[in-house]
């Protein structure tokens, strides 16, 4: 394990931007601490829309669906009309409805209450991967980070993986990312973050910022 030239490059950005990363992560924690069941449900729904779609578009779609409460009571054929800005809109509209049905009790959304019954981050993530259609480890990790549980997990999208190759954390971009390989790369990233003394959730925002020039979600 070493700090290569590329690390020196991103370390400069980190020193300039670390206070912004910390502030953003604090905002994520506040979503969980102060958010309602519906707030947390929106965050989970957002991560269903993100695969192969821009995060900004996915969040815009969620914002539009929230306006008329469609996200909480609309049928799949109604939701799909608002998903033109994300890919795989037909499947994703069905996934949103299935998610809502799972997270509803006595006519009320219980998303935050439900996840509070799963004591660890690992248990929360495993439940999502096994029970929510359209969500793999990447999307589950994304959701958990966005509600303040990202200290020890990785969101291994193509931007992060490409940067892990440049940092020599992994040798090459994986052709497919199986659950086993995901966890192996996550462990390597965890070790590397410890080595360079940059918290894992801050490293994620740093590498995203390096690629996109923005700190979003």
From Swiss-Prot:
The record marks 217 as: Important for guanine/8-oxoguanine distinction. Its EC number is 3.2.2.-, 4.2.99.18. Keywords: DNA damage, DNA repair, Glycosidase, Hydrolase, Lyase, Multifunctional enzyme. It catalyses: 2'-deoxyribonucleotide-(2'-deoxyribose 5'-phosphate)-2'-deoxyribonucleotide-DNA = a 3'-end 2'-deoxyribonucleotide-(2,3-dehydro-2,3-deoxyribose 5'-phosphate)-DNA + a 5'-end 5'-phospho-2'-deoxyribonucleoside-DNA + H(+). Pfam families: Ogg-HhH. The active site is at residues 138, 157. Coiled coil: none annotated. One of its GO terms (biological process) is base-excision repair. One of its GO terms (molecular function) is class I DNA-(apurinic or apyrimidinic site) endonuclease activity. The keyword Hydrolase applies. Belongs to the type-2 OGG1 family. Catalyzes the excision of an oxidatively damaged form of guanine (7,8-dihydro-8-oxoguanine = 8-oxoG) from DNA. Also cleaves the DNA backbone at apurinic/apyrimidinic sites (AP sites). NCBIfam families: PRK01229.1 (NF002305). This is 8-oxoguanine DNA glycosylase/AP lyase.
């Amino acid at each position: 394990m070493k700090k290569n030239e590329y690390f020196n490059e991103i370390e400069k950005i980190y020193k300039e931007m670390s206070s912004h990363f910390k502030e953003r992560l604090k905002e994520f924690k506040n979503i969980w601490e102060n958010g309602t069941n519906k707030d947390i449900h929106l965050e989970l729904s957002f991560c269903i829309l993100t695969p192969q779609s821009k995060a900004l578009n996915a969040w815009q779609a969620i914002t539009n669906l929230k306006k008329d409460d469609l996200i909480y009571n609309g049928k799949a054929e109604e939701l799909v009309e608002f998903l033109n800005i994300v890919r795989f809109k037909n499947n994703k509209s069905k996934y949103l409805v299935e998610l809502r049905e799972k997270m509803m009790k006595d006519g009320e959304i219980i998303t935050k209450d439900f996840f509070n019954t799963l004591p660890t981050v690992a248990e929360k993530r495993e439940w999502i991967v096994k029970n929510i259609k359209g969500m793999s480890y990447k999307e589950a990790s994304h959701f958990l980070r966005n509600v303040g549980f990202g200290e020890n997990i990785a969101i291994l999208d193509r931007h992060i993986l490409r940067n892990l190759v440049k940092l020599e954390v992994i040798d090459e971009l994986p052709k497919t990312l199986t659950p086993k390989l995901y966890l192996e790369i996550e462990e390597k990233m965890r070790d590397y973050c410890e080595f360079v003394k940059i918290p894992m959730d801050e490293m994620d925002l740093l590498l995203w910022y390096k690629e996109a020039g923005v700190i979003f979600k």
